[in-house]
Curated annotation (Swiss-Prot):
InterPro entries xrefs: RetroV_VpR/X (IPR000012)
Organism encoding this protein: Human immunodeficiency virus type 1 group M subtype B (isolate ARV2/SF2)
UniProtKB keywords: Activator, AIDS, Apoptosis, Cell cycle, Host G2/M cell cycle arrest by virus, Host nucleus, Host-virus interaction, Ion channel, Ion transport, Modulation of host cell cycle by virus, Phosphoprotein, Transcription, Transcription regulation, Transport, Viral penetration into host nucleus, Virion, Virus entry into host cell
Protein name as annotated: Protein Vpr
UniProt-annotated stretches for the region Homooligomerization: 1-42
Note: HIV-1 lineages are divided in three main groups, M (for Major), O (for Outlier), and N (for New, or Non-M, Non-O). The vast majority of strains found worldwide belong to the group M. Group O seems to be endemic to and largely confined to Cameroon and neighboring countries in West Central Africa, where these viruses represent a small minority of HIV-1 strains. The group N is represented by a limited number of isolates from Cameroonian persons. The group M is further subdivided in 9 clades or subtypes (A to D, F to H, J and K).
Amino acid sequence: MEQAPEDQGPQREPYNEWTLELLEELKREAVRHFPRPWLHSLGQYIYETYGDTWAGVEAIIRILQQLLFIHFRIGCQHSRIGIIQQRRARRNGASRS
């Protein structure tokens, strides 16, 4: 006989509160990696497209996540995650072949 799952602890935060916290976290990280005028233009585009709606919040979250993922994947020089590019050290111009 099927039973309802047991209580798994406290409920998650309300969706809108969690979403706004996620957006703030993404904005803080994006400002560290992209020019502010560029991010401002992105925000203006989202506002003009979606207005002041939850769809706009979800869209900018999705775009910032994608941009940051690609940025880290390519190899951000001050990244805490992602691929760390190892520079080949050349001493006195010599290289191994």
